Amino acid sequence: MPGDEKPVGVAVLGLGNVGSEVVRIIENSAEDLAARVGAPLVLRGIGVRRVTTDRGVPIELLTDDIEELVAREDVDIVVEVMGPVEPSRKAILGALERGKSVVTANKALLATSTGELAQAAESAHVDLYFEAAVAGAIPVIRPLTQSLAGDTVLRVAGIVNGTTNYILSAMDSTGADYASALADASALGYAEADPTADVEGYDAAAKAAILASIAFHTRVTADDVYREGITKVTPADFGSAHALGCTIKLLSICERITTDEGSQRVSARVYPALVPLSHPLAAVNGAFNAVVVEAEAAGRLMFYGQGAGGAPTASAVTGDLVMAARNRVLGSRGPRESKYAQLPVAPMGFIETRYYVSMNVADKPGVLSAVAAEFAKREVSIAEVRQEGVVDEGGRRVGARIVVVTHLATDAALSETVDALDDLDVVQGVSSVIRLEGTGL
């Protein structure tokens, strides 16, 4: 019976939205969790920055001495949900080095220091779990590390940031510009006071690094991930997207690439992209997340759900806690880091996609042929072209706008083409360059 087993001591570091929910689940579901683990889970302490009486938990559980809490002999598992890279890194390493398993949701730390943390866990023969670091409540880490362990993953792509997906969904459905949609997201609590990490793609890039590392058995850091944000997306881009039967989503894409010489590389990238309305990811709206995994034998799998928030993230954290505690009781370990492949990261210029290019041009004859010539010079094939008038607030035509959709082209060739277009006298400026994804997602 669970009650006959030695209790598993748990320390929780952080008592914000996620930490509070984790503590609530541990306390309110104690009997069920004990049955699933095979022993009671006992909360030994909660690490906070400041000990105050208004935290909703017994004050005797609170401490601001993180190092002392992690070092306690009666703590077997440390749950880290503090957030910042430091002091989280120090606390996690301290726990692992003392032989304690760790559960963390710290994507920023994992995207830069997974190797160091995994090595510390390996040396101490303990577990390091981080399901909640990517896409909140959506189970995607465990399927990649366990369910698909016998398969070859080819591609992982999806929407992994709820803030940007809410903003883009609002722009799509209401016609709002970026600033208005961001203000709405902030008012509803979907965007941080400083939204840079979300809207510039840093958050999604950290998650892409984690997913690529796991899926392809190599080591990818956030610095290896090509990144673009959503701040330059305009209502006009959505209008053109609709005309093409698409919407716009911020995608994280990780894929295995075979070069012409037959060697294997990994690509990891984050950017806004046009997605066909027929694709399942186009229907992922609001703050929801979704991840599509493609594997050789399993084919295409899709995971969908809430990607952020206290309760959804705590669900994933507590799931990891149960796994780590069960291993502790049984004297076993969970999956170890698998980095045997050591694949190089492909530079962005190597990647082939289709492109949507929008530019403001002079409203006179010969402009379209001049624009098309620059694409042809760099062997970028045009699939579709549209030209429309630009009017001022009074309805007077003041210029023209050309939208070009290409066939597959390398990023390097497209970048050269855009630079050349900007140098043309008849082009007043290239306003948008957005990739088209969908057929390979």
UniProtKB/Swiss-Prot annotation:
Catalytic activity, EC: 1.1.1.3
Keywords, ordered alphabetically: Amino-acid biosynthesis, Metal-binding, Methionine biosynthesis, NAD, NADP, Oxidoreductase, Sodium, Threonine biosynthesis
EC supergroup of this enzyme: oxidoreductase
SUPFAM superfamilies assigned to the protein according to its UniProt record, in alphabetical order: ACT-like, Glyceraldehyde-3-phosphate dehydrogenase-like, C-terminal domain, NAD(P)-binding Rossmann-fold domains
Record field: catalytic activity: L-homoserine + NADP(+) = L-aspartate 4-semialdehyde + NADPH + H(+); L-homoserine + NAD(+) = L-aspartate 4-semialdehyde + NADH + H(+)
General function of this protein: Catalyzes the conversion of L-aspartate-beta-semialdehyde (L-Asa) to L-homoserine (L-Hse), the third step in the biosynthesis of threonine and methionine from aspartate.
Protein name in the entry: Homoserine dehydrogenase
Keyword NAD attributed: yes
One biological process term in Gene Ontology: methionine biosynthetic process
GO cellular component assignments: peptidoglycan-based cell wall; plasma membrane
PROSITE patterns linked: ACT, HOMOSER_DHGENASE
Organism: Mycobacterium tuberculosis (strain ATCC 25618 / H37Rv)
Residues noted as binding NAD(+) in the record, renumbered to the chain: 18, 37, 47, 309
Pathway: Amino-acid biosynthesis; L-methionine biosynthesis via de novo pathway; L-homoserine from L-aspartate: step 3/3; Amino-acid biosynthesis; L-threonine biosynthesis; L-threonine from L-aspartate: step 3/5
Lineage summary: Bacteria, Bacillati, Actinomycetota, Actinomycetes, Mycobacteriales
Chain positions recorded as L-homoserine binding sites: 192, 203
Cofactor: record remark: A sodium ion is seen in the structure; a metal ion may subtly affect the relative position of the nucleotide-binding region to influence enzyme activity, and could increase the stability of the enzyme.
